[in-house]
């Protein structure tokens, strides 16, 4: 990934971010790195650093952030929010910026529609995998005393997907979402 060049500043960024999420406080970040050091996405993608996103957002470099594609690396696991001593909530800043990106017509990565399809079918991003013992005996969820997976109320869940606008945002066909 290319280095982000900070050429233009959006001085209204903090108010835009706070309009979307009151929990996001990039202006309070003092770059202690607790968020980045605990971030699973930062461990996988060295260019992803929640503290740097906080600083760039606070400085008003919104165009560079949303055009870089880096925001989509966030797993929204909330580890950064939990670890932050200032309660700046990097995850809320990142989600606010991705919302701004989508509102400006910037599409999420191509894998997102497939993830949404899996979520609408399975209730989770990943499909269940088989588990095997050392002896290669395959175990079911029942064998492991795990609760049943799936969507408890499919009608309500699909309605929630419509309410949040995922069908339109990700340009999914209605028939794909209703499977």
Which residues does each predicted region cover?
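N-terminal leader/targeting helix
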Residues: 54-72
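Cysteine-centered iron-sulfur cluster-binding motifs in ferredoxin-type domains/subunits
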Residues: 25-42, 68-88
């Amino acid at each position: 990934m290319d280095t982000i060049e900070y050429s233009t500043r959006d001085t209204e960024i903090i108010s835009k971010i706070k309009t979307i999420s009151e929990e996001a406080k990039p202006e309070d970040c003092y770059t202690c790195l607790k968020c980045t050091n605990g971030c699973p996405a930062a461990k996988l993608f060295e260019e992803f650093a929640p503290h740097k996103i906080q600083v760039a957002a606070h400085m008003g470099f919104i165009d560079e952030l949303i055009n870089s594609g880096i925001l989509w690396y966030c797993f929204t696991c909330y580890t950064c929010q939990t670890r932050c001593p200032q309660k700046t909530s990097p995850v809320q800043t990142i989600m606010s910026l991705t919302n701004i990106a989508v509102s400006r017509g910037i599409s999420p990565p191509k894998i997102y529609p497939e993830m949404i399809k899996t979520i609408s079918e399975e209730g989770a991003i990943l499909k269940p995998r088989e588990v095997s013992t050392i002896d290669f005996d395959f175990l079911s969820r029942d064998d492991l005393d795990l609760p049943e997976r799936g969507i408890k109320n499919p009608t309500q869940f699909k309605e929630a997907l419509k309410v949040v606008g995922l069908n339109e945002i990700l340009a999914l066909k209605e028939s794909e979402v209703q499977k």
